[in-house]
């Protein structure tokens, strides 16, 4: 999972891109990068770390130009600690291309071999985003054949990308001297929207909050399979480039990943989480009598709307029992299980008075590996709770995700091939209540805002095992596991600077 942004303007864009990336920081904390363009020349800075740490004043001054793009990275393939795999990625032909990508390709290995043997292109990293960039570059080269580039050529190239690439991808690319290109996979698994400023500036971003927070008016979502091209005069061109597009956004965006003040594909993330709390309340009643619960406490922060709604419906007190250290990243998206476990107590501290002598119902947005949940239950008991009940606003995560969330291996999922009671014993809580899959889908779908069409399908593969692209086999999942983020020790990774430094690593 990553956050991406692109800006086309008649004024410098470096500060705009920086501000938008800050608003998308929750989508990735591993690395950040920005590219701008002036006089057909790209200027790039990228490195490991948070946005505020990667970009200093001197870096911002070296990013001139009225067009650019950026990314905050959360690795789902390749090496989690490699600075070389920070985005944007660059290739010099045709024209000069830079690209940022949110998602995960399910056929990256086959494409990489095809690029080498047939297209005669070299891939220097383990990142599927570099593969995607080279596919786009080849399709553009094949389409233009040395002739001037037109919007029709761009859309024809994207059609070629859709034919070759499988999986999830929201993409923003900059074509030197020509303009800004954005497109989504034919299933719209990863979000992408566009907005416009009062001065005519266009901004593309993963979430609407990046538009609103930088004073851009939300215009619309990029449709599944659609491509948008903004030329150097900031004229917008768009075309549907997929044969049979079908909107199936990732439901985990609404459960956990997106900011609550965002709207994705017309669905309010905040309202979706309220709805999830409402349906979860019904599940709680069937498992634990509300009279046996003294207080409802959320696990900060994504679960707060669901927990508050649940408490209100059950007529129970809602209290903040955990204080979050905001300077520690989101534990779910930290690379490496050992790093996640260590960070739980660094991230959360209990307010003991809310637990002592009480039966507490803890509400979390989801339970993936169980590492965080077990630590939190133990913290509640140490604070004096008599009984600790755990409720998840999402159903059990039983299946690997192959579309860009860092949970691909079955062995890492606490719910895989286990009953709810077996999971309860692992987490060590007194009762465990999960959301229902169908209820979750309905709750999220019913959060659509007025004026937007209802979403009829979701990618909920980590919950129901149904892969919406229809081309993912057990063998594919095993192959993808081989290329998931390396979990090598970070100190070891920091000392490994031996790889050849090419433009993609600058």
Region annotations inferred by a language model:
Residues 160, 209-210, 214-226, 282-283, ...:
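Phosphate/diphosphate-binding loops
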């Amino acid at each position: 999972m990553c956050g991406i942004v692109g800006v086309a303007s008649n004024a410098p864009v470096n500060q705009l891109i920086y501000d938008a990336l800050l608003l998308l920081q929750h989508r990735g904390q591993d690395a950040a990068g920005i590219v701008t363009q002036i006089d057909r020349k790209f200027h790039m800075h990228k490195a490991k770390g948070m946005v505020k740490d990667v970009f200093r004043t001197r870096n911002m001054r070296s990013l001139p130009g009225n067009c650019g793009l950026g990314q905050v990275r959360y690795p789902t393939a390749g090496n989690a600690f490699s600075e070389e795999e920070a985005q944007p990625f660059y290739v010099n032909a045709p024209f000069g291309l830079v690209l940022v990508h949110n998602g995960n390709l399910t056929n990256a290995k086959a494409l990489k071999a095809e690029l080498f043997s047939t297209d005669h292109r070299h891939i220097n990293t383990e990142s599927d985003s570099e593969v995607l960039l080279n596919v786009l570059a080849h399709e553009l080269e094949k389409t233009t054949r040395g002739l001037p580039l037109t919007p029709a050529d761009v859309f024809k190239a994207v059609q070629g990308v859709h034919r070759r690439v499988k999986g999830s991808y929201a993409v923003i690319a900059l074509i030197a001297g020509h303009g800004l290109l954005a497109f989504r996979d034919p299933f719209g698994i990863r979000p992408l929207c566009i907005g416009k400023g009062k001065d005519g500036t266009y901004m593309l971003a993963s979430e609407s909050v990046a538009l609103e927070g930088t004073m851009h008016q939300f215009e619309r979502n990029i449709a599944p399979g659609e491509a948008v091209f903004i030329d150097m005069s900031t004229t917008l061109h768009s075309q549907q480039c997929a044969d049979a597009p079908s909107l199936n956004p990732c439901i985990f965006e609404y459960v956990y990943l997106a900011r609550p003040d965002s709207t994705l594909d017309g669905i309010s993330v905040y309202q979706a989480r309220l709805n999830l709390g409402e349906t979860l309340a019904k599940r709680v009643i069937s498992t634990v009598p509300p009279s046996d619960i003294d207080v409802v406490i959320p696990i900060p922060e994504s679960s707060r709307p669901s927990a508050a709604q649940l408490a209100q419906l059950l007529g129970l007190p809602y209290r903040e029992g955990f204080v979050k250290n905001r300077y520690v990243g989101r534990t779910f998206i930290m690379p490496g299980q050992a790093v996640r476990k260590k960070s739980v107590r660094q991230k959360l501290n209990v307010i003991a008075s809310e637990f002592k002598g009480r039966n507490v119902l803890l509400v979390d947005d989801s339970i993936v590996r169980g590492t965080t949940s077990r630590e939190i239950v133990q913290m509640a008991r140490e604070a004096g709770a008599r009984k600790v009940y755990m409720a998840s606003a999402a159903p059990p995560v039983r299946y690997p995700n192959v579309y860009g969330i860092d949970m691909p291996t079955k062995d890492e999922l606490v719910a895989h091939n286990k009953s709810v009671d077996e999971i309860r014993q692992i987490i060590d809580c007194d009762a465990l209540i999960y959301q229902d899959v169908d209820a979750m889908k309905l709750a999220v779908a019913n959060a659509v805002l007025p004026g937007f069409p209802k979403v009829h399908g979701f990618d909920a593969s980590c919950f129901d095992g149904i892969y919406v692209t229809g081309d993912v086999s057990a063998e594919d999942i095993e192959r993808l596991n081989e290329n998931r983020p390396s979990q090598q020790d970070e100190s070891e990774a920091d000392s490994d600077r031996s790889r050849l430094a090419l433009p993609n690593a600058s």
